[in-house]
Amino acid sequence: MKNALSRICYKEIFMKLIHCADIHLDAPLESVFPPEGAREYRRAVLSDFSALVESADRNGADALLIAGDLFDSDNTSERTVRHVLDLFRAHPNLSIFYLAGNHDGGGLTARSDLPGNLHTFGQDWTYFDFGEVMIAGGTAPDPAALSLPPERVNVVLLHGQVRGGGKGSEYSISFSKLKNKNIDYLALGHLHTYREATLDARGIACYSGCLMGRGFDECGRKGYVLLETVNSRVNHTFVPFASRVFHEIPFDVSGYTSCPELESALRKETGNIPKTDFCRLVLKGQVDPECPPDIRQLQTDLAGSFALLRIRDETTLRIDPRDYENDISLKGEFIRRVLASEQDSAEQERIIACGLRALRGEEPEI
């Protein structure tokens, strides 16, 4: 244990712990990325986790708390597992407390070649007396059996979905049963967004969120929680750390009449997003049926601006039936017939948009 696990700072004894979760190493993510993009993403996540361990040790952290789902499945490649174990061995002064989550399986904890600074939790409550901190956790423990000394700083690791009461699944956590158990900090994993809540008069609970988003449903900065114990208190701070971020950018295209003009506006809107990040543009507003945004062309022209680009077209057509009352062209007849059909307005717009593209000689976007 490093420096007797404590340091004197302005006459206050303190320790520094890092809480992370949901790294999901080796996640396939084939539904999000093309094959090469998925491989690049997996390398980036492993690189970020390695950087976190190195940063923790370099900046004087006493321990890294992993609250579940370090790996995405129990079929993680041997190469990735060995990388992680070698990483831990390379930082012997940093204690690693690893709680397996619902994705991890038991492959890692069953190995015989674990480094000496890696500490794991069983199914029931497992306790570690770590300097001024008591660390407890379990993969499926009975909350009623939790016993923590009131005079200590107590940190508990659990993985699952918090529920208010009643019976839940194996990976559900009852807040009510953990109240008044002398918990100072409840380090949670399972949700991929940072959240914090008051546990009781003494303790707080935090989901650290994932270290890097896994799709456009996990946009925004991701990272870890820094814990500092000062005079038997726990201070916590969320620290953004992900090297790559998912962004969703809504953009009103009303009034834009050409693809180059719209492309220029979108480049300006997204100019502050790093090229290594992932971006989804959501186009909104009303557009002239004669010149709707050319999504495929925009996708092609802007693709090199980000590691991954998706464009979602949520625009609606600005159609006034009176404009086509006396139009004797094929286009006018087509629009009148569609507007007179029993289809709902959304389906009518889709049909008209496809039809107009076909009439212009373009490939319809079905």
Model-identified regions with their sequence ranges:
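Extreme N-terminal starter segment of soluble prokaryotic enzymes
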Residues: F14-I18
